[in-house]
């Protein structure tokens, strides 16, 4: 598993946003909104990463392995909802970008809900960090499609900060189930575009703790969904490097910055 650690960044334009720009009902806001969403953050290249490593509490990792049961994907417990343009044409698997996913779960029933859309609204994103939802989006980088996964490890509450390492390991353990839910729930698109199973999965762990505020490459989707991970490569990004990376932002990064 290739691993890259990045700090949070703040864009001056997005520091004090007007939340109304996400309402497509107002034409004069629509153009400004599109300009923001077209800004994308580049994935760091290995040449931009200095050598380094991350040390973890092996007791926490082992506790998660032993005490947190491995969740097996059960398609009968998955509910799929299509929103936006995809609501009118669910069978159209050709719309790959923009295409986003939000996977939510119920702790009591173990039921899953996968929302598939071409946009992410603020109400959905608030649920991302309040209910431990997982957000994903397809993104084209250098003519290659990649699936970007976003998990909120800590930063939204004191309890999350205290349990940052525990939450990181739990998210890591549950990610194969998340990927299986995406593949099953959006089966029409994957059936029409089988090459997407070879697309690389990039996982963004968002945290106020620098150690867990990181990006990890989990390899091809077909392997990541099975929990198979490749060789480990780690490194730290310097603050200078991170500033250079603030060139383009994904839909998710733009919306997330609006909540900060």
UniProtKB/Swiss-Prot annotation:
Task: Identify the domain of life.
Answer: Eukaryota
Show the InterPro entries listed in the entry: Staygreen
**What tissues contain this protein?**
Expressed in cotyledons, pollen and young leaves.
Transit peptide, residues from-to = 1-45
> Any coiled-coil ranges, and where?
none
* Plastid recorded as keyword: yes
Q: Where does this polypeptide localize? A: Plastid, Chloroplast thylakoid
This enzyme's EC code(s): 4.99.1.10
Any Pfam family hit: Staygreen
What is the reaction catalyzed?
A: chlorophyllide a + 2 H(+) = pheophorbide a + Mg(2+)
Q: Which UniProt keywords apply?
A: Chlorophyll catabolism, Chloroplast, Lyase, Plastid, Stress response, Thylakoid, Transit peptide
Oligomeric state and interaction partners are given as: Interacts with the light harvesting complex II (LHCII). Interacts with the chlorophyll catabolic enzymes (CCEs) NYC1, NOL, PAO and RCCR.
What is the documented function of this protein? Magnesium chelatase involved in chlorophyll a degradation in the chlorophyll-protein complexes of photosystem I (PSI) and photosystem II (PSII). Contributes to the degradation of PSI and PSII in the thylakoid membranes. Recombinant SGRL possesses high dechelating activity against chlorophyllide a, very low activity against chlorophyll a, and no activity against chlorophyll b. Contributes to abiotic stress-induced chlorophyll degradation and leaf yellowing during vegetative plant growth.
Q: Which family does it belong to?
A: Belongs to the staygreen family.
| Entry protein name | Magnesium dechelatase SGRL, chloroplastic
């Amino acid at each position: 598993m290739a691993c890259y650690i990045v700090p949070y960044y703040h864009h001056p334009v997005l520091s004090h946003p007007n939340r109304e720009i996400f309402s497509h009902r107002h034409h004069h806001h629509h153009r400004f909104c599109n300009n923001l969403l077209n800004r994308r953050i580049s994935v760091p290249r290995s040449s931009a990463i200095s050598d380094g490593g991350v040390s973890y509490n092996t007791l926490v990792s082992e506790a998660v392995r032993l005490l947190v049961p491995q969740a097996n994907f059960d398609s009968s417990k998955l509910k799929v909802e299509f929103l936006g343009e995809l609501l009118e044409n669910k069978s159209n698997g050709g719309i790959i970008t923009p295409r986003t996913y939000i996977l939510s779960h119920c702790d009591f029933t173990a039921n899953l809900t996968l929302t598939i859309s071409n946009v992410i609204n603020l109400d959905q994103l608030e649920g991302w960090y309040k209910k431990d939802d997982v957000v994903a989006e397809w993104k084209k980088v250098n003519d290659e499609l990649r699936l970007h996964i976003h998990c909120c490890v800590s930063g939204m509450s004191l309890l999350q900060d205290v349990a940052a390492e525990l939450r990181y390991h739990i998210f890591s353990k549950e990610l194969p189930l998340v990927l299986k839910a995406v593949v099953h729930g959006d089966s029409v698109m994957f059936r029409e575009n089988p090459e997407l199973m070879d697309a690389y999965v990039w996982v963004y762990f968002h945290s106020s703790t620098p150690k867990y505020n990181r990006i990890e490459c989990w390899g091809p989707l077909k392997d990541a969904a099975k929990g198979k991970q490749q060789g480990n490569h780690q490194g730290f990004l310097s603050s200078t490097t991170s500033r250079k990376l603030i060139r383009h932002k994904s839909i998710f990064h733009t919306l997330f910055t609006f909540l900060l």
